Amino acid sequence: MTDKQSVVIIGGGPAGLTAAWELIKDGGADKYDVTVLEGTREFGGISRTVKHNGNRMDIGGHRFFSKDERIMDWWKTVLPLQGAPSYDDKKLGRDHDMEPGGPDPETEDKVMLKRHRVSRIFWNRHFFDYPISLSPNTLKAMGFKLTMVAGFSYLKSMFHKLPEDNLENFYINRFGRKLYSMFFEGYTEKLWGRHPSQISADWGAQRVKGLSIMGVLKNAFQKLLPKKRSNAEVETSLIEEFWYPKYGPGQLWETVESNCEAAGVKVLTDARVVEVRQTDGAVSSVVYEDSEGNRTELSGDQFISSMPVKDLVNAIDAAGADPEAVDSKPAPADMTEVANGLPYRDFVTVGLLVKHLKLKNTTSIPTLGNPPIVPDCWIYVQDPGYKVGRLQIFNNWSPYLVKDVDDTVWIGLEYFCEEGDSFWNMSEEDVTKFAISELTRMRVINGPDEVIDSHRERVRKAYPAYFDTYEHMDELIEYLDGFGNLYCVGRNGQHRYNNMDHSMARHGGRRQHQDRQDVQEERVVRQHRKVLPRRKVNKPC
């Protein structure tokens, strides 16, 4: 029997934990010695769930849906689908296809709920479907004149295509200039802090993909057909049902971490990697720092990194070269320059627990609450008059996220900013007052007296951005690929705005078959810039 291969995984988010489990499951502990280094005390990265005074807050909102059925099956093996109605299912008389033999969410905690997606856009004090559609409600809210202008604008875009060398042109080609100016221009600038004309079209190629007015119309037509469509046939932004853990996405990743430890993975928290040491063209060890500033070196055969590319490059031989190794040296100056220029958008979410909503449920969708609350999971605030980018109503994600789900409403306000700017540096008291004032101006609540409790969370490097030195990513990728035993995975590890399922599929632990959709996506993105390839951890797998 050969010696075990030692694998060091940097990061306990979706990509890192997926890699750890895929390596260690089914007797993998006999082949691999796996260590996960997580820089915080929580698991799941941006997919974690924050607990506050009996209520739970989902950081960013995470629907469990994938076009890859293997990912869906993977989630289901961690948290089985509900086999009985949840609290709100029973109270509202909702029907779902229950999983035969599945757990009862009223009596068991390890369970995945089936949820109905409702998301809308708030613009000019009106609600529109999300993604934007040509529904009667949309046409009524826009009015006849604006609808005609938007319609002719879209027709023009069908026959006069712009070069897709930036995100602005990408959107105009799919929605027309009028709808772009209404719903995409200001919101994109709010999200990224840059005008869409300054952002690479790569972001649209990856995140928007097949979404367009024609895509929306096609989806509406297909919904009228009796044939049930598979996940792969539905544009991700248009899905109507998704899965969601009883206690939020963090519950799933906490369960995966627990399973990993039980199977033999060594997991270290408060272990922030500060140096990556190389010897003779390969990574030989990493140095991590604990919460008290103590540093420890950990050697390995293979290294899987989900830490931000900027931090990874700066960590390479950060303390100086090993004098006994000829080619042990820090990253070249030009690579460091590219890495340091990679932009990120940081994120602040403010949770507000309120007594009532001023906003009324005018839909036909039944909801909890007294009076019944609006049915939205998300409300996208496209209106440029507000800084908040998106609202989450946690009651509608899972009734088990809210301590008193019948008599209180737990809302998350999502703000995009940059670490160190004036909004990021606001005190929790001031940012809470600001959030309350925005909800009041939007007429979501009556005023400050409605607020019972609040909580602020700040997230660094939440969104890898597609401008500045991003255009030189191919050079940085080539440099990192030169380390034959280093594999960059996940959203920040690849500097790619992945969904959670994409981060899992590109986990670096074992080669996964690329389905047709992924191949098409890769081709579209590579028209603009080479992306990090999927690679197998050849030696340990």
Give the location of each predicted region.
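Beta1/beta-strand and adjacent pyrophosphate-binding region of the FAD-binding site
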Residues: 2-15
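Conserved Rossmann-like nucleotide-cofactor binding loop
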Residues: 15, 42, 310
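Short, well-ordered alpha-helices that flank and scaffold nucleotide-derived cofactor binding pockets
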Residues: 21, 25, 258, 314, ...
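Glycine-rich FAD pyrophosphate-binding loop
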Residues: 24-52
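Conserved flavin/dinucleotide-binding core of flavoenzymes
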Residues: 48-49, 131-132, 372-377, 386-541
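Dinucleotide-binding Rossmann-like beta1-alpha1 core, especially the glycine-rich loop
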Residues: 53-158, 209
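Active-site/ligand-binding neighborhood in enzyme catalytic cores
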Residues: 136-138, 142, 146-279, 284, ...
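Mid-domain catalytic core of redox enzymes
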Residues: 245, 271-429, 434-443, 479, ...
